[in-house]
């Protein structure tokens, strides 16, 4: 075991001690994805980054990657759905709220994106940073049919739930391979130096 691997394992062990266990952990991941997708709240919560990190942790034994993906997808869907309902029910009134008023530029960007791409914007908008939570809100306010919204939102949430924790998982696998090959490469260089000296 290399020193770097030992330090990583010790750091992860300490981190795991602070994280909740079992169902509570998956609820936390679901809430993070929910918040990331909720109109306005997603600006404050780095849900994508946290879900990538959770995928990395799953590789190292913190929970099941499959359950993690499901929790992230379900949370993302419900955040979208609530944003859609808020847009349909309260659209302009909610935009008058002091906090959202400061983000009208993002609402306008979401409106333009929705006008250009229609229902597909619900699917693709999830992957466009700051406007992510505003797209479902705008779709609801624009009177998008709920059935069409649900189809795009379910597909988008499933892909997001798979992509972000999956990215963390595969980054961890790649990191392990880099560490393994770095160690071997170092030995080859050392052997070459010994032979030449």
Regions flagged by a language model, labelled:
Residues 1-31, 56-148, 172-190:
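Membrane-interfacial helix-loop-helix
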Residues 155-197:
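C-terminal membrane module of polytopic membrane proteins
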Residues 41, 81-85, 161-165:
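Membrane-embedded alpha-helical segments of multi-pass transporters/permeases
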Residues 33, 37, 55-56, 164, ...:
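Structural signal for membrane-spanning alpha-helices in multi-pass inner-membrane proteins
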Residues 30-49, 125:
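Transmembrane alpha-helix interface/packing and boundary motifs in multi-pass membrane proteins
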Residues 49-57:
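Hydrophobic alpha-helical segments within and immediately flanking transmembrane helices
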């Amino acid at each position: 075991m290399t020193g770097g691997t030992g330090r990583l394992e010790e750091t992860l062990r300490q981190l795991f001690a602070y994280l909740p266990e079992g169902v509570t952990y998956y609820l936390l991941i679901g809430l993070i994805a929910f918040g990331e997708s909720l109109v306005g709240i997603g600006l404050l919560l780095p849900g994508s980054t946290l879900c990538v990190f959770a995928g990395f942790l799953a590789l190292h034994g913190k929970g099941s990657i499959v359950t993690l993906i499901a929790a992230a997808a379900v949370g993302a869907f419900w955040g979208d759905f609530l944003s859609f309902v808020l847009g349909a029910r309260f659209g302009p009134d909610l935009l008058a709220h002091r906090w959202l008023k400061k983000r009208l530029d993002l609402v306008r960007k979401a409106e333009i994106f929705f006008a250009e791409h229609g229902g597909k914007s619900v699917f693709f908008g999830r992957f466009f940073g700051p406007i992510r939570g505003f797209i479902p809100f705008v779709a609801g306010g624009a009177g998008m049919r709920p059935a069409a919204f649900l189809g795009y939102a379910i597909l988008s949430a499933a892909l997001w739930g798979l992509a972000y924790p999956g990215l963390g998982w595969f980054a961890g696998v790649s990191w392990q391979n880099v560490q393994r090959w770095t160690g071997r490469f170092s030995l080859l260089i050392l052997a070459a130096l010994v032979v030449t000296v």
